[in-house]
């Protein structure tokens, strides 16, 4: 979806379409994808039906797992803040510095990297385990976030798009099953709380970026803050006691 929308916008720019016409083009693409999704929901593949009936075992109760639940909430909120600045402002990092390349193509790379990421990170969780997989995911994400602050070159921005695109959905893939396994340890809906905190991070990111940009006239302070948030999240995961 990210890839299609980005390339649709780039096509609109190349054809000198107005913003209203580009919005209509994006709406057409969304409508086609919605039709496919509705058809899939009405006749789900047999594999999805079987998977929906698979029961998962609950871990043993105790103070350690309760602490793990609260720690995961903090990690997820920090992750929401950490990725959103790059995801929001990525094309602007190259805006005005390229003559013949539309910066919106960076969004296409972001989407291409995200497309297979959930499947890959799921396999990596099975191989490495939750703690190592999420720690590495957040560290790679932090690296991708900080790269444009080191250099606004095309290479660094492309690497940033690929790294953040490949890892941000991986964070969700790794964290939500863990949240489900810990949900019985808290008195509220764990998945809902995680989604809310992730959203708070997503809202706070652009607001803080705007404030810092007014002070420094640069995205670098916000990128450093986002990378720091991801490093703190990685540290919280890495130092968690293993059951």
PLM regions and their residue ranges:
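Helix-to-loop junctions at the C-terminal end of transmembrane segments
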Residues: 117-130, 213-214
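Structural signature of the two symmetry-related core transmembrane helices
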Residues: 132-147
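Intracellular juxtamembrane helix-capping segments at the cytosolic ends
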Residues: 169-183
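Extracytoplasmic gate region of multi-pass secondary transporters
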Residues: 67-108, 115-116
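Multi-pass alpha-helical transporter architecture, strongest
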Residues: 33-42, 224-243
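A membrane-interface helix-boundary motif in multi-pass transporters
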Residues: 13-29, 210-230
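Helix-loop-helix hairpin linking two adjacent transmembrane segments in secondary transporters
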Residues: 1-42
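A late C-terminal transmembrane helix in Major Facilitator Superfamily
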Residues: 182-218, 226
